[in-house]
């Protein structure tokens, strides 16, 4: 693999000039920068990750904390799309991705310890128990964090509009002629609370009176639990004509 010295010799410039061109420093002519970069591409030059980390104070390594209790993994119908988009954007910007977990080569460690061990530049947290002490520890640490569908006061978050989503779903059911609409929701999270709020808001706007027994506690991605709650709804004297599932 060619080195900075090889590139410098090929282009007839100093190693310092090559370094400036590859690191997009401003004090170098645009034509020289492009000539050096073209030579780097032609020669197959790749920067040394350790050297780049020392120079830029970045590892270009991002962590992903994804804990799916239902073990659907990367086939999760929602988060798989989120993580795939994240992967594409990260790769386009030259970042690698590390999945954060508890066990490294047989050694148990906290999420924060794993982040420090891998020297990640930041972490995306998705599909976890946000009240887990280890998650709270990570969020409150010096590691930059972005959370998905959960808000911590001092951290950046990317949110779905769960209120509007459920309202649209209820109104679509209403437009199809349904007036007895039930809702089996997931376990207690901020996402669930917003969806329940959207459900009741839509029902109120449509003038629908929803019996208390029409709103059931379920578990996300738990088919058996959903089937159990569905049977309970269908056993009611006046059963719903439409059921919204988690």
What is the role of each PLM region?
Residues 2, 27, 31, 49, ...:
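Residues at secondary-structure transition points
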Residues 45-109, 200:
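Amphipathic helical "hinge" segments at domain boundaries
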Residues 51, 111-112, 135, 170, ...:
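Short hydrophobic/charged patches on amphipathic alpha-helices used for structural packing
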Residues 108-164:
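Short beta-strand-centered segments that line the small-molecule binding cleft or hinge
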